[in-house]
């Protein structure tokens, strides 16, 4: 039986420093039936040249150049437009894949006969040891998958997942352009609601880079948190699966985004400039934390949410300090390993 073709759509914008590692990790996959779609979003560095160089080396690579910057949603829609594979995988141009990432995702989605499959993700600056076995693979209902994604108990974003292209095309699912952030969350949200079931693996085979200073994960920008609040509220309006489990999850996600907004504003020192947003977010977190704590099953999270609801400003500052400390430690380990 011929293997299924996988279209890997890579979103690229000013990532020349990291792009070679990203592309090398894709072309070196142990699963070979790939269509590699590199979409450059009008980069001003050498990203475009790197793409063309690799296209000359590997016939599986197709390169598309945007004449103006359209952000992640526009880039990924271009990739979808030109994809022909049975499955779709999205990769950010500054991230990279474990050598068997695609074969592992294929195993999950085909073994479970699902419409999409999810694996775990490493948020890191360096390669980490992989498990020697594939571990447990689960099948989730759309309700459970949506709740776990929205809470979020899983990494939000379109990467670290594989999608059945037929489902995407049949339901005309595309990225919503014009959003500043969370366009990937919205896409996954739409796919899950149209899926019959979702396969879930336990291995971390997608590496999300932490040391890109322009990444949403490492760069403070209040537009990220405020945009996320807008997107999640819109998702709540558009819910098809309106069970208590999903509604509790989405309410918690909204609450977490308001807490994130407090963190962003504090990190940027804009408490006075963004006073209305800052004060409203504090009020929202204080007013609604009890329901979030009651719904949360994990003890450590219960404690964190309780403290965040009672002392949102203090906890936001501590969370920012923790995030910065973790990044510094990871970078120190990366530099140490590189010098060995």
Please name every model-derived segment.
Residues 1-27:
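N-proximal low-complexity "stem/linker" segments adjacent to membrane-targeting elements
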Residues 26, 41-42, 70, 93:
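Conserved short acidic donor-positioning loop in nucleotide-sugar-dependent glycosyltransferases
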């Amino acid at each position: 039986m011929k293997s299924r073709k996988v279209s890997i759509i890579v979103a690229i914008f000013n990532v020349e420093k990291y792009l070679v590692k990203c592309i090398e990790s894709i072309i070196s996959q142990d699963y070979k039936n790939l269509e590699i779609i590199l979409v450059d979003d009008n980069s001003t560095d050498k990203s475009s040249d790197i793409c063309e160089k690799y296209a000359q080396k590997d016939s599986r690579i197709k390169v598309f150049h945007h004449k103006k910057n359209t952000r992640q949603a526009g880039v990924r829609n271009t990739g979808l437009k030109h994809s022909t594979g049975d499955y779709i995988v999205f990769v950010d141009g500054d991230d990279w894949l474990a050598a068997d990432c695609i074969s592992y995702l294929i195993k999950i989605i085909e073994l479970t006969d699902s419409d999409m499959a999810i694996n775990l993700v490493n948020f890191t600056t360096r390669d980490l040891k992989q498990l020697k076995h594939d571990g447990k693979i689960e099948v989730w209902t759309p309700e459970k998958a949506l709740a776990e994604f929205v809470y979020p108990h899983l990494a939000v974003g379109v990467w670290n997942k594989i999608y059945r292209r037929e489902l995407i095309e049949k339901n005309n699912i595309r990225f919503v352009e014009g959003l500043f952030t969370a366009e990937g969350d919205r896409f996954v949200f739409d796919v899950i609601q149209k899926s019959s079931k979702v396969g879930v693996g336990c291995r971390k085979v997608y590496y999300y880079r932490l040391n890109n200073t322009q990444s949403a994960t490492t760069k403070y920008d209040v537009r990220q948190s405020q945009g996320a609040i807008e997107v999640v509220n819109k998702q709540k309006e558009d819910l098809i699966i309106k069970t208590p489990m999903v509604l509790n999850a989405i309410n918690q996600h909204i609450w977490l985004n308001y807490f994130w907004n407090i963190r962003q504003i504090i990190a940027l020192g804009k408490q006075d400039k963004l006073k209305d947003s800052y004060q409203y977010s504090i009020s929202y977190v204080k007013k609604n934390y009890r329901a979030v704590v009651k719904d949360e099953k994990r003890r450590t999270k219960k404690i964190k949410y309780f403290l965040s609801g009672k002392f949102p400003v203090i906890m936001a500052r501590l969370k920012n300090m923790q995030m910065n400390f973790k990044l510094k430690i990871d970078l120190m380990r990366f530099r140490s390993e590189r010098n060995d």
